């Protein structure tokens, strides 16, 4: 029988009032929200179930720095929301856990569901090596080892991380899908994608360029907006047509543009891999 893999929002919450508020506010279609007030129970749960956790929610308390140290030492990298008290003083500067963490105060809990989506979206853009602060990364062998990945395989590695093959990607918020955007938002997104894709093409054969980061950015935007492969193809064709006209004006051959079919194949392969892994596995 086919069924989706259960996913969980896992919290370490010291205040019963905040725990109850999380349960009341959490209406996401992710299957389950569990939280603990005991750090030991929280860690035991992660040891047993970390591969089913979609996002962590950590209420900041006296023991939180030690919990974060435990997460770093065990190379447990997950989307995370840190909740600080609502006070006149701003929360302490981060990052505390990793650079994609989302900071909330207790008077912002009404934003919980949207911020869970933000935490997941921000996290999947990061490779394991850039997710944690550098002073942590190079001090901890487990994390350092996980960061030594051939740049050409960074997206694949990210997809195999804690979220990767467990189906979190099919939990996208359909409200942000391209087909549901206003005409103005559609134009804005397409302009952003065209700009990023143009940069990818111009830098693709430059070994010094950060082209993989550009591809990751393009694919993330396209995936979470549910952009089709045919739309990506249209962006490529439009750009090649522009370049072709420019080459003709300069009296140069268009043959060079054939090389950029590799760029298109690379981008579409990354996007298709995202979509493939968004389909729940059969068990």
UniProtKB/Swiss-Prot annotation:
Q: Which UniProt keywords apply?
A: Biological rhythms
Quote the InterPro entries the UniProt record gives.
CheY-like_superfamily, Circadian_clock_KaiA, Circadian_clock_KaiA_N, Circadian_clock_protein_KaiA_C, KaiA/RbsU_helical_domain_sf
Record-linked Pfam families: KaiA (PF07688), KaiA_N (PF21714)
Give the span(s) annotated as PsR domain, binds oxidized quinones.
3-133
GO biological-process terms attached to the record? circadian rhythm
Q: Where is this region: Flexible linker?
A: 164-172
Domain annotation KaiA N-terminal: ranges: 3-163
Tell me the PROSITE patterns matching this sequence.
KAIA_C, KAIA_N
Described by its record, this protein's role is as follows: Key component of the KaiABC oscillator complex, which constitutes the main circadian regulator in cyanobacteria. Complex composition changes during the circadian cycle to control KaiC phosphorylation. KaiA stimulates KaiC autophosphorylation, while KaiB sequesters KaiA, leading to KaiC autodephosphorylation. KaiA binding to the KaiC CII domain during the subjective day yields KaiA(2-4):KaiC(6) complexes which stimulate KaiC autophosphorylation.
Q: Subunit structure of this entry? A: Homodimer. The KaiABC complex composition changes during the circadian cycle to control KaiC phosphorylation. Complexes KaiC(6), KaiA(2-4):KaiC(6), KaiB(6):KaiC(6) and KaiC(6):KaiB(6):KaiA(12) are among the most important forms, many form cooperatively. KaiA and CikA bind to the same region of the KaiB(fs) form and therefore compete.
Domain comment from the record reads as follows: The N-terminal pseudoreceiver domain (PsR, approximately equal to KaiA N-terminal) binds oxidized quinones. The KaiA C-terminal domain mediates interaction with KaiC, homodimerization, and is responsible for the clock oscillation function.
Name this protein carries in UniProt = Circadian clock oscillator protein KaiA
Q: Which organism is it from?
A: Thermostichus vulcanus (Synechococcus vulcanus)
């Amino acid at each position: 029988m086919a069924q989706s893999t259960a996913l969980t929002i896992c919290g370490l919450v010291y205040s019963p009032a905040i725990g109850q508020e999380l349960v009341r506010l959490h209406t996401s279609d992710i299957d389950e929200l569990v939280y603990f007030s005991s750090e030991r129970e929280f860690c035991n749960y992660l040891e047993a179930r970390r591969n089913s956790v979609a996002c962590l929610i950590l209420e900041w308390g006296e023991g939180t720095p030690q919990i974060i140290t435990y997460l770093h030492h065990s190379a447990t990298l997950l989307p995370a929301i840190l909740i600080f008290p609502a006070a006149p003083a701003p929360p302490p500067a981060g990052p505390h856990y990793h650079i994609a963490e989302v900071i909330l105060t207790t008077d912002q809990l009404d934003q919980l569901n949207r911020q869970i989506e933000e935490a997941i979206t921000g996290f999947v853009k990061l490779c394991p090596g850039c997710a944690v602060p550098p002073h942590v990364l190079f001090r901890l062998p487990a994390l350092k080892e996980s960061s030594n990945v051939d740049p050409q395989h960074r997206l694949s590695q990210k997809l195999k991380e804690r979220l990767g093959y467990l189906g979190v990607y099919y939990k996208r918020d359909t409200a942000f899908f391209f087909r549901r955007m206003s005409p103005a938002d559609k134009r804005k997104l397409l302009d952003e994608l065209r700009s990023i894709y143009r940069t990818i093409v111009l830098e693709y054969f430059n070994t010094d360029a950060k082209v993989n980061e550009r591809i990751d950015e393009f694919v993330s935007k396209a995936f979470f907006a549910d952009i089709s492969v045919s739309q990506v193809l249209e962006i490529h064709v439009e750009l090649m047509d522009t370049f072709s006209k420019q080459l003709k004006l300069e009296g140069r051959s268009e043959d060079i543009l054939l090389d950029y079919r590799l760029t298109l194949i690379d981008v579409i392969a990354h996007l298709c891999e995202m979509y493939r892994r968004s389909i729940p596995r059969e068990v």
